[in-house]
Amino acid sequence: MLHSALLNGVIMVGIILVINIIYVTFLTLRMILTLKGQRYLAAFIGTIEMLVYVVGLGLVLDNLNQIQNVIAYAVGFGIGIIVGTKIEEKLALGYITVNAITKELDLDLPKQLREKGYGVTHWVVGGLEGDRTAMQILTPRKYELQLYETIKSIDSKAFIISYEPKTIHGGFWVKAVKKRRIKE
């Protein structure tokens, strides 16, 4: 009988842990999708999220006198955040804008990036040690690391900073970046 009760306790902890990992993964993805303007997909995920949440919370509240259930709920919450953000990183939704400034004036770098499929706007800027090339580059997030490596392979001392644009309207970027495939 003791063995059966212990087994049931372990199973309950496992169920609560898994349910909360699933719940918080959905919660994290829903929040990210909402921030990226994917409201319908976010609403669908939110519906599933709430179903899972109610079941998980119900199990914990029905067994609140068992501290291991509360701990499993809390640990599942933390793991769910990690899992959700890892999934979002793999999906790499949206675009990034990268601003890069070369160490020295290099008008060939924008051309090389365009040949690889990136949308590039460039201009000459004055730096402390002379003229440099500044570029603004739009790319899907899934190509972000590849873009950094490409820039660094051409100019290892380039200054690079990136951010996620909230809205993109008009110009070459909207039409061409969506159609283009970035070349290795």
From Swiss-Prot:
Keywords: Cell membrane, Membrane, Transmembrane, Transmembrane helix. It comes from Bacillus licheniformis (strain ATCC 14580 / DSM 13 / JCM 2505 / CCUG 7422 / NBRC 12200 / NCIMB 9375 / NCTC 10341 / NRRL NRS-1264 / Gibson 46). The chain crosses the membrane at residues 9-29, 41-61, 67-87. The lineage of its organism: Bacteria, Bacillati, Bacillota, Bacilli, Bacillales. InterPro entries: DUF2179 (IPR019264), DUF5698 (IPR044035), UPF0316 (IPR022930). This is UPF0316 protein BLi00691/BL01474. It is found in: Cell membrane. One of its GO terms (cellular component) is plasma membrane. It comes from the Bacteria. It is a multi-pass membrane protein. Pfam families: DUF2179, DUF5698. Belongs to the UPF0316 family.
